[in-house]
């Protein structure tokens, strides 16, 4: 009898959307067919939870809130999560990697997300927070709550990606409607999750396995740089590498990082020289002591494009801690995904390119 050889199981990756903002982000990911992950939506508001497209939905704090939400009070969100701590633990048990996503500043997401992250880390999961910071017009109280929630979350994640909503305005038309602006925020969250997840779930020419991702992201506790850039033509390698580390949303650069993953995706015409060029561009812009893990993969939908995805960690948190003491939008956070500054074409993996081409 011939037995099929098993070369290793794919990592179990779960994405937990907490509160209204997290739930919206989850719905956007499902609509855009993000693969290789399981989705969990957690909320105190039973009506909002019914709108979730997630396979796994959990109402927390039934006794505390009676299904009516947290009333923009993070302490209520926190207590609601603690009320269902064991159920949350059961949902996350057995995971290799857990993304915790929410919109910071409200009640459920701000209060419950740190609890979910703490449970995840205690279970031994690689835990990544991907959250947003409010628009300025949402008020000082909401901003203050958001900054406090971000610092609480930071204590319980391996890596944190924070997306300031105000910065998202840099990549959309000023006449964009409020609804579309919030949708774009959801898409940025989705791209961040998808960009990381696909590195470890999609087979490549030079694979980056989950152990590599864990080594770069585990226990860092800092805000991560995640950049995605696309290049075309003769100088596509240089163009993609530079776009990946220079974003209109970016407020940190790769120079302060100590660890990074660089993944290059292209059609079958990718050359060794192009991979070498990408790596040289990244190294020249970064700390000379940076430890880089690299990988490469094929995607036949790219039609001549070359994509570079960079995840960099190991930044000093000193300045970020000071931000909470003096809340300020201008001090904001770091980010992630970009559009080409010269036109309206998104830069990113094939799923992002195809999404644009459909419009």
Tell me the role of every PLM-derived stretch.
Residues 1-359:
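Tubulin/FtsZ superfamily GTPase core signature
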């Amino acid at each position: 009898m011939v037995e099929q050889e098993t070369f290793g199981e794919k990592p179990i990756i779960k994405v937990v959307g907490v509160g209204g903002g997290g739930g919206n982000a989850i719905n956007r990911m499902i609509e855009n067919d993000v693969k290789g992950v399981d989705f969990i939506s957690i909320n105190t508001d039973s009506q909002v939870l019914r709108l979730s497209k997630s396979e796994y939905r959990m109402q927390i704090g039934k006794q505390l809130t009676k299904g009516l939400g947290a009333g923009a009070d993070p302490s209520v969100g926190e207590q609601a999560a603690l009320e269902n701590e064991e159920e949350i633990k059961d949902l996350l048990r057995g995971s290799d990697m857990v993304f915790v996503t929410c919109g910071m500043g409200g009640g459920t997401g701000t209060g419950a997300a740190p609890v979910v992250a703490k449970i995840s880390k205690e279970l031994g999961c690689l835990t990544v927070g991907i959250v947003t910071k409010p628009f300025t017009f949402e008020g000082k109280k909401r901003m203050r709550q958001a900054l406090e929630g971000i610092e609480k979350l930071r204590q319980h994640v391996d890596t944190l990606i924070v997306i300031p909503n105000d910065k998202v305005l840099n990549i959309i038309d000023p006449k964009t409607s409020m609804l579309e602006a919030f949708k774009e925020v959801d898409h940025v969250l989705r791209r961040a999750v998808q960009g990381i997840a696909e590195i470890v779930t999609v087979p490549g020419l030079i694979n980056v396995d989950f152990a590599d991702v864990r080594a770069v992201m585990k226990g860092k506790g800092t805000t991560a740089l995640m950049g995605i850039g696309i290049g075309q033509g003769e100088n596509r390698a240089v163009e993609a590498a530079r776009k990946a580390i220079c974003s209109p949303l970016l407020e940190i650069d790769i120079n302060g990082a100590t660890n990074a993953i660089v993944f290059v995706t292209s059609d079958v015409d990718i050359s060794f020289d192009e991979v070498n060029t990408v790596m040289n561009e990244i190294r020249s812009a970064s700390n000379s002591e940076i430890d880089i893990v690299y990988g490469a993969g094929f995607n036949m939908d790219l039609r001549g494009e070359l994509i570079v995805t960079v995840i960099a960690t190991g930044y000093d948190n000193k300045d970020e801690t000071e931000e909470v003491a003096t809340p300020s939008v201008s001090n904001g956070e770091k980010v992630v995904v970009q559009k080409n500054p010269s036109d309206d074409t998104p830069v990113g993996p094939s799923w992002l390119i195809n999404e644009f081409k459909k419009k």
